[in-house]
């Protein structure tokens, strides 16, 4: 039977302002849950449960499930449907303190079909809690996942690649076509697995994320130009030759570790405030 594409699912009209596209493909749902492999002792958190496509099979694996949902209509619906077994945090995931859900001795795991219109800022927000999280599994626009896992030298390698790869090991788990959703998005989707690097096993030196954000924002500000042009303003405060950093390269050719080295050499007064804009590369 053909799936509905009207945007109305289980009596709920998908809201464009919340970026709602409801997952309706049972095969994809089961594949995602299998990839997550929830364990009874996990502290499992779902962002944007929507109408419960992932929520139901996840709740079959854990005693309680915590969810973060912005849509008030869906919050009420979820509470009526699942009762005390579901702990609902009503509010914006972009402002939620995920660190408060960490329980010593238990694995904090975060999953979700993320709204594509806020995916990059939400990923950056979540990175602040990486030291308390075991792993994350997210459905995202495939183009975003491609950027997240891209290697230096590829066209997809970007600011987002650098800022997330320094915090996580990441891999593409599953590709998902538009027809798996109601309403179908205009783009292909994919599931990504994100595992925070343990402090003692990270391939990268510790780095101030604001300093790294400052460097990569400058570096990728004009992708077609070599770094001698985009990072030229830093030559007065950083000895690039001493770092062995070749300014004749383009930003997309530079390994993450090289960006980290530059960020660690950046004087505090040159660090830009706030989080970098990761939406455009």
Curated annotation (Swiss-Prot):
* UniProt entry keywords in alphabetical sequence: Cytoplasm, Methyltransferase, RNA-binding, rRNA processing, S-adenosyl-L-methionine, Transferase
HAMAP family per record: 16SrRNA_methyltr_A
PROSITE patterns assigned to the protein according to its UniProt record, in alphabetical order: RRNA_A_DIMETH (PS01131), SAM_RNA_A_N6_MT (PS51689)
Q: What does this protein do?
A: Specifically dimethylates two adjacent adenosines (A1518 and A1519) in the loop of a conserved hairpin near the 3'-end of 16S rRNA in the 30S particle. May play a critical role in biogenesis of 30S subunits.
Concerning NCBIfam families, the annotation shows: ksgA (TIGR00755)
Give the record's GO CC terms: cytosol
SUPFAM superfamilies assigned to the protein according to its UniProt record, in alphabetical order:
S-adenosyl-L-methionine-dependent methyltransferases
Q: What is the lineage of its organism?
A: Bacteria, Pseudomonadati, Pseudomonadota, Betaproteobacteria, Burkholderiales
Where is this chain primarily localised? cytoplasm
Instruction: Give the enzyme's EC designation.
Output: 2.1.1.182
Q: What is this protein called?
A: Ribosomal RNA small subunit methyltransferase A
